Swiss-Prot record:
This is Nitrogen regulatory protein GLN3. It comes from the Eukaryota. Keywords: Activator, DNA-binding, Metal-binding, Nitrate assimilation, Nucleus, Phosphoprotein, Transcription, Transcription regulation, Zinc, Zinc-finger. Residues 1-45, 187-208, 224-262, 355-398, 449-516, 593-673, 696-717 are annotated as: Disordered. Residues 18-32 have a biased composition (Basic and acidic residues). PROSITE patterns: GATA_ZN_FINGER_1, GATA_ZN_FINGER_2. The keyword DNA-binding applies. Residues 33-43, 252-262 have a biased composition (Polar residues). Residues 224-240, 370-384, 449-470, 482-499, 596-631, 641-651, 658-672 have a biased composition (Low complexity). It comes from Saccharomyces cerevisiae (strain ATCC 204508 / S288c) (Baker's yeast). The 9aaTAD motif is a transactivation domain present in a large number of yeast and animal transcription factors. The lineage of its organism: Eukaryota, Fungi, Dikarya, Ascomycota, Saccharomycotina. One of its GO terms (cellular component) is nucleus. It is found in: Nucleus. GO terms for molecular function: DNA-binding transcription factor activity; DNA-binding transcription factor activity, RNA polymerase II-specific; RNA polymerase II cis-regulatory region sequence-specific DNA binding; sequence-specific DNA binding; zinc ion binding.
Amino acid sequence: MQDDPENSKLYDLLNSHLDVHGRSNEEPRQTGDSRSQSSGNTGENEEDIAFASGLNGGTFDSMLEALPDDLYFTDFVSPFTAAATTSVTTKTVKDTTPATNHMDDDIAMFDSLATTQPIDIAASNQQNGEIAQLWDFNVDQFNMTPSNSSGSATISAPNSFTSDIPQYNHGSLGNSVSKSSLFPYNSSTSNSNINQPSINNNSNTNAQSHHSFNIYKLQNNNSSSSAMNITNNNNSNNSNIQHPFLKKSDSIGLSSSNTTNSVRKNSLIKPMSSTSLANFKRAASVSSSISNMEPSGQNKKPLIQCFNCKTFKTPLWRRSPEGNTLCNACGLFQKLHGTMRPLSLKSDVIKKRISKKRAKQTDPNIAQNTPSAPATASTSVTTTNAKPIRSRKKSLQQNSLSRVIPEEIIRDNIGNTNNILNVNRGGYNFNSVPSPVLMNSQSYNSSNANFNGASNANLNSNNLMRHNSNTVTPNFRRSSRRSSTSSNTSSSSKSSSRSVVPILPKPSPNSANSQQFNMNMNLMNTTNNVSAGNSVASSPRIISSANFNSNSPLQQNLLSNSFQRQGMNIPRRKMSRNASYSSSFMAASLQQLHEQQQVDVNSNTNTNSNRQNWNSSNSVSTNSRSSNFVSQKPNFDIFNTPVDSPSVSRPSSRKSHTSLLSQQLQNSESNSFISNHKFNNRLSSDSTSPIKYEADVSAGGKISEDNSTKGSSKESSAIADELDWLKFGI
């Protein structure tokens, strides 16, 4: 807005000239019109000559044609040569510049702007003469806005805004304002100027020199020579300045804001362009002007180079104690070792440290920022990858073991009850397993089908194995843990724990309620096994209370397994131990085994009927073996493995194979299992799993006895031995 006061001052100057000449506002307007049309006075002739020269020159034509907008400019010139108008209103501007279409729109703005400023200016008209000289002098001295002072003073007579702004813009900014149309009111006039073909910067600079020169000449009757000198200087400066502003036409706000300081701002813009990115880009746009190009080029930050290794690229620039610029590597080396980093250590690759991987690495590796770092990183990666691979192998092995045993168990169970096995297979799905509450609520006759779920019914032994492997992988881990705990018992107990022992319904195979109860028991066992299976009391309590005539939870599990009335086997996530996971449970299980052995006689009748199921429920023996572990796991294994899996098929004969607890359970059940043992022996002979062999190995010669135990006496002896062994293990 400095332009406005300047314009007002210039306008005042114009008014002062007008006042000095004593012309009325209307007279200069008329004279201006007549001048624009024809030269009335000698001064007017000079103006017309100037205009004619501009028009003929073509360089100044834009100014002149802007002047049709600037007809007030002609009026403004007239006051110097002939009486000039004190002030030209926008209405007069409209009259004087009917040719400009843009002016009409801008005139409304001019009305507000021009009218308001002339009012302010009118008060200072008395000072105009002094101000004009001061303006010329200041411009002359500082080369600030000579064209502004001269051009604006001359041009701005009628309208401080219309004539003044384009004028000083021509002078200081060149045609920047006319092109950029910084001010909307000027934008119209400047647009009209822009519309003129002769607006070229060079032509403007030259024409400007002529234009302003003529204007000064015409205007400054008092100080024409100074004005001419000023204009020449201004033109020379403006010729340089104009180009950037013309190219910066969109960003001319700075220059336009201060007409007097426009040149100064140009000089300021040069360093700014070097410093700030935006200004630098701006300077690049301005770069056409030599003045801006040179400073911008000079001001570009020189590429920073490491004093030591001469590199240009580093994540962080450092400084040596001497103040030399160093790259990050050299700076750190200097800081740590106090010497310059040898160039032999220089590498083209900037190495980044990965804290997690590097933490495992030794300091020397860290010190070596070179290939060792990536190598160490790769090694750490490989090591980290190796661990999961091992765990995967373990889980796969567990899966394979569980698969093998369940297959045999399922096969035996299939021989007994394919439906039950199918139910168990499907039922093994934990996803399909309803919550214990639901399980309890469901009757097992219906719940067997429901519990198994549609997908379970569809599962065959092969699919079941896949399904079990998919569902049980977390369980295998648990089972592996259990097996590790049960490893005290024997490897066979591990295998038996891995072998799925389906939890069968209550000993009465006929009662759906007992089945439901067994299912509830199984669910409770499953839940207990999952949650508190380790607690000896909890799982046995649930088992004993829930399941059976037989007191021992293991037998109950076994019975439920053996019964599996409608494939009641309730899948347990922790199949390794139905009763509990802890070895302490084994002690309880031993007691329960004795009880079960007693109860087994009772339950054995059930199991005899269920033996075929119980063949799968070798898991019963498995449960007895790993009573802590087996009961759940055998259920799992039964679900996982086909009926044939020997763990299920070995009631007493496999007892040696199974954990001692399971064997004891089998022995206790041996009376009932004698037939079952025969059947189981058949099954065991039919299918032997590595688990059984492990159990046999653990059991020692008992395995052969158990395998040969088609007679109850052998079974009973094996049972006693197993019980002793379990006691010893406990």
